[in-house]
Amino acid sequence: MDQLEMKKLAAQAALEYVKADTIVGVGSGSTVNCFIEALGTIKNKIQGAVAASKASEELLRKQGIEVFNANDVSSLDIYVDGADEINPQKMMIKGGGAALTREKIVAALAKKFICIVDSSKQVDVLGSTFPLPVEVIPMARSQVGRKLVALGGAPEYREGVVTDNGNVILDVHNFSILNPVEMEKELNNVAGVATNGIFALRGADVVIVGTPEGAKIID
């Protein structure tokens, strides 16, 4: 079974958490794209969705699902998103698709965060296999880069990428994130940082892992 098939298994299993007549929070990325396709099969059951990226908005509309603005929603029943890495405490690194700030905003609206991944995304320590994305206001790029170096990281400017918010991304290598909560707070306090890709303060509540044996649920 290939990686795409495992992503589809996890995405399909997430439909079990979708309640009738609710607005669903939707993240971004390849696994979420599988979820949006699956959501299209039950679109008449839900009111619509709030999306964390313009790309996800477009896919939702193609499926005939109404897209709501986050400002018009006081809370969401669930938020479904993928991850670049996830640890046993259900904390994540996200932001490979450069939508991390909006993902945090939509996740914060949700009562329950459902993370859907394939088994390759599971790690013991965050930062093991994937650099940490940091979204930065453009005028602060060099300044933030120096701060990240001082913290022991090796930031790399993600060429040609502008986020939906008009910001840039620094991918930070060499971070072994042993205390995700504290590092998330520390990096978010750096002047010029919009947010960083550690999702520890608001981690996942349920993890659905697509494996060759089927969807495995960790709650």
From Swiss-Prot:
Q: What is its EC number?
A: 5.3.1.6
Family annotation (InterPro entries): NagB/RpiA_transferase-like, Ribose5P_isomerase_typA_subgr, Ribose5P_isomerase_type_A
Q: Which Gene Ontology biological process is one annotated for this entry?
A: D-ribose metabolic process
UniProt keyword terms in alphabetical order: Isomerase
Q: So what does this thing catalyse? A: aldehydo-D-ribose 5-phosphate = D-ribulose 5-phosphate
Top-level taxonomic group: Bacteria
- A Pfam family found in this protein is Rib_5-P_isom_A
Q: What class of enzyme is it?
A: isomerase
Q: What's an example GO cellular component term for this entry? A: cytosol
Q: How does it assemble?
A: Homodimer.
Annotated function:
Catalyzes the reversible conversion of ribose-5-phosphate to ribulose 5-phosphate.
In Swiss-Prot or TrEMBL terms, this protein is called Ribose-5-phosphate isomerase A
